[in-house]
């Protein structure tokens, strides 16, 4: 008969044959015994981390009991009153669960007195029974004993037929989600402990569970499972990152879909632009250095705001940094030409210069051709600084360059997460919570076109792959929190600029216009503005000036 979750089980190993008189067991016999013990221990460990209270050596006995149970259930003489209201707890404890059902079915007379019987083992079947507590805060481990017990009801789900009564087991999606999360964390723990055999078995289990889990949880688990598999098999380098290898501009295309699908990038651009506008209120010439131009989506809105300024718009000079171009492409200049057309329509005097750089740490002050006597200088970075943390000294080199050109304001937008820790398991747990919130917010945007949603998920999935599977200089998605960036910026000689209540109110208004889900939140925290989903902040905008 079928086993739980479609798995099959081998009977316990047979005893070794007795050795001949005067002879000890052969080396082959010893090796076979060791292999059997190792396999048995491996199965026991896998069953434990997946929440089943049974050993592989007990599976033959459990299978025999299940066959007896099937024979009893197929008997039409079994009174329906025994089945209808029976409640059995803890099916993860296979042996006791089957034993309790057989015991009740073999004593149907007692059901007249109490139609609800239970076999309860509360110590092992809640979330604490499965390894991976680090995925859940300890203060949330409060359970109502009656409400939290998992039940399988027989009778109401069993339909009699002329042939036999068949039991249908319905798997609760919430319980599957819990098992999925715990299997993910258990796999990460196995990798952390360098138990790659167990990790390999668990990542396959995650793939099976993820395939049966609908919604955001199933999607994010699939990306994490792929990343864990790449780490287990050591199959990740910058060269094997398929999306980047196909075309460096592919990520820019993905980012455009992410921009359209949710308010995070809109919030980033809007709040940074608000800080810039307040810093250049009286300036007649504005020079913005964008450390990551991408598709230039941030700047039309700023030019439009400058065009509406009383007394006429200032001149606007934009220096955009981008990756090195291919031989037959000059996308930076093409983008500059499009922005120039837009500026002309707005009546804004515009000048553009594109700079190609392998790394932002390669930039030197003289490359920017600043005009301090006549221009107000602005430096802008959206999701760029964290990439420099992959190489020692790179972020310090860039910040020293920025400091040397003496900007009036530096605007910084970064992910509000700590994915730069040296301990893999901590980084994994943080990433699992962070990206689960992002995927959940995408799933809640019910009016989102399917193409935008899918491409946005790919955009985030690439980040998950890098955070989990990569190491060394290949791991560039090294996000840090606002508190961590505050320490870095202050040590480099910058002081924070408080983003005031006006920016907060306008950001909240923007959110009401563009956000399709009702779980988005804007908050002000220590002079920074944050956007998040439900109670979790996800993106932070901050502004800085020379100390």
Curated annotation (Swiss-Prot):
Result after altering residue 441 to C: No effect on GA-mediated degradation
UniProt region (Disordered), positions on chain: 1-42
Record note on what altering residue 52 to A/E does: Resistant to GA-mediated degradation
Motif position, VHYNP motif: 87-91
Record annotation: effect of changing residue 411 to E: Resistant to GA-mediated degradation
Spans annotated as PFYRE: 377-466
Result for mutant: residue 535 to E: Resistant to GA-mediated degradation
Limits of the GRAS domain: 171-545
InterPro entries hit by this protein: DELLA_N_sf (IPR038088), TF_DELLA_N (IPR021914), TF_GRAS (IPR005202)
Motif (VHIID): 286-290
One GO process term, biological-process aspect: gibberellic acid mediated signaling pathway
Annotated GO MF terms: DNA-binding transcription factor activity; sequence-specific DNA binding
Broad class of where this protein is predominantly found: nucleus
Gene3D superfamilies membership: Transcriptional regulator DELLA, N-terminal domain (1.10.10.1290)
Posttranslational modification: Phosphorylated. Phosphorylation on Tyr residues is required for proteasome-mediated degradation in response to gibberellic acid (GA). Dephosphorylation may be prerequisite for its degradation by the proteasome. Ubiquitinated. Upon GA application or seed imbibation, it is ubiquitinated by the SCF(GID2) complex, leading to its subsequent degradation.
Leucine repeat II (LRII): annotated span: 334-366
Motif LEXLE motif, residue numbers: 66-70
Record keywords, A-Z: Developmental protein, Differentiation, Flowering, Gibberellin signaling pathway, Nucleus, Phosphoprotein, Plant defense, Repressor, Transcription, Transcription regulation, Ubl conjugation
Tissues of expression: Predominantly expressed in germinating seeds, flowers and siliques. Only detectable in the inflorescence, with high levels in young flower buds and significant levels in siliques. In imbibed seeds, it is restricted to seed coats, elongating regions of pre-emergent and recently emerged radicles, endosperm (especially micropylar endosperm), and embryonic axis. Not expressed in leaves, bolting stems or roots.
Disruption phenotype: Higher germination rate in the presence of glucose and at supraoptimal temperature conditions. Rga, gai, rgl1, rgl2 and rgl3 pentuple mutant displays constitutive GA responses even in the absence of GA treatment.
Effect upon mutating residue 481 to E: No effect on GA-mediated degradation
Region span, VHIID: 255-320
Residue ranges of the motif LXXLL motif: 385-389
Entry's free-text remark on domains: The DELLA motif is required for its GA-induced degradation but not for the interaction with GID2.
Family: Belongs to the GRAS family. DELLA subfamily.
Annotated protein name in UniProt: DELLA protein RGL2
